Amino acid sequence: MNNNTTAPTYTLRGLQLIGWRDMQHALDYLFADGQLKQGTLVAINAEKMLTIEDNAEVRELINAAEFKYADGISIVRSVRKKYPQAQVSRVAGADLWEELMARAGKEGTPVFLVGGKPEVLAQTEAKLRNQWNVNIVGSQDGYFKPEQRQALFERIHASGAQIVTVAMGSPKQEIFMRDCRLVHPDALYMGVGGTYDVFTGHVKRAPKIWQTLGLEWLYRLLSQPSRIKRQLRLLRYLRWHYTGNL
């Protein structure tokens, strides 16, 4: 077994995170020895850390997820501050999803897509098939009624999907994945937020240079000034970081 099929864990404010060195490490870990892992992937950023602190239900949901990873640069910096020897890098959820889809297409892994607007979901399916020949065994947009959830879980189970990606925003997508796993446990679940919108070009992502510099949050703020309240809320996380309350 090579070093890429295992990964250390680090604890921030009671939350255990997987420490991936880079994207290749993440992929090799998830596909260790050619066998796709089963469980739930959850991207962790500063905003989600605050939600975990303030919402007991969300904290329980995310603690139960097997694969929590550093999606935000602030999380990476906090891990490195608390664990100076840590070799951990940011793995952006949107990038990880694309890499998973490319790998799934190559290996014929069955995929079920959940969430998003109907037109965005349709475009996502078409692009995945055209770009990577992804074996999409089913899909459902995010506009279904609560009473339709159980039937959807059964559809996912009947499809035999080995990867289920859910774009519903947090904590709705974590609740959905938790409940769906009771019916269809043998799969890798991934909460992907607005990834389908980015993938299909409906939402513009920060240029690579902004991402590399860890300034994607600033690009979003400049693009969407209405996010200012959300960004100001993150000052609380900065206080934890700079006072070492991690």
Curated annotation (Swiss-Prot):
Record carries keyword Nucleotide-binding: no
Disulfide bonds: none
Entry function: Catalyzes the synthesis of Und-PP-GlcNAc-ManNAcA (Lipid II), the second lipid-linked intermediate involved in enterobacterial common antigen (ECA) synthesis.
Gene Ontology molecular function terms on file: lipopolysaccharide N-acetylmannosaminouronosyltransferase activity
Gene name of this polypeptide: wecG
EC numbers on record: 2.4.1.180
Protein name: UDP-N-acetyl-D-mannosaminuronic acid transferase
Keywords, sorted A to Z: Glycosyltransferase, Transferase
Organism: Shigella flexneri
Catalytic activity from the UniProt record: UDP-N-acetyl-alpha-D-mannosaminouronate + N-acetyl-alpha-D-glucosaminyl-di-trans,octa-cis-undecaprenyl diphosphate = beta-D-ManNAcA-(1->4)-alpha-D-GlcNAc-di-trans,octa-cis-undecaprenyl diphosphate + UDP + H(+)
Pfam families, A to Z: Glyco_tran_WecG
NCBIfam families: PRK03692.1, wecG_tagA_cpsF
Record family assignment: Belongs to the glycosyltransferase 26 family.
Enzyme class: transferase
GO BP annotations, alphabetical order: enterobacterial common antigen biosynthetic process
Pathway: Bacterial outer membrane biogenesis; enterobacterial common antigen biosynthesis
